[in-house]
Amino acid sequence: MQVSDFTFDLPEHLIAQYPAAERTASRLMHLDSETGTVNHYHFADLPSLVNRGDLMVFNNTRVIPARFHGKKASGGKLEVLLERVLDDYQALVQIRSSKSPKPGSTILLGSPNGLGQNETAVHVEGRAGAFFKLRFPSPGVLKIAEQLGEIPLPPYIARDAAVSQSSEDAARYQTVYAKHEGAVAAPTAGLHFDDKLLATLAEQD
């Protein structure tokens, strides 16, 4: 098997910009490993495709609001994406900006509409490879993320950057079994499970 076996063209107009009304209404492609036959189902059909004793492994990390909008002291806009929380007050991040902020400078994180509401000053301590190391003030990285951050949707999901994130996006980009905070991206295969489907699968065990 070669990695190239999985290469395919995906037209942009076929990429769903919003989820199905019901999580389990998403489409499911099934490949029979013995015959090579491909069949198409809906995710709600999953229980009919698994057997007693099959092992299913779930990633129960919870996506944090890891994307911030902000600006440099000069006024230039930037976007910050948390990559790794080092401790309560320090984090490694990606910064998207026309010009990178300098080590020792301060950036302001705030609302995406640029109105300057609830802005928080964050210190740029320096570079760490491809990332920047930031120091956050009290109450710390995760608390500030909850106050000012957004759930980082994938780049192929188009949203107006000037509009605050909807509560629907924030809820649907979490699995129903998410518990442990820390992920900056959802384990997307798990987004199609709902509580009813999980209960049905548990009964088959």
How should these model regions be labeled?
Residues 1-20, 35, 40-44, 55, ...:
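Internal, non-catalytic "lid/hinge" segments that mediate substrate recognition, gating
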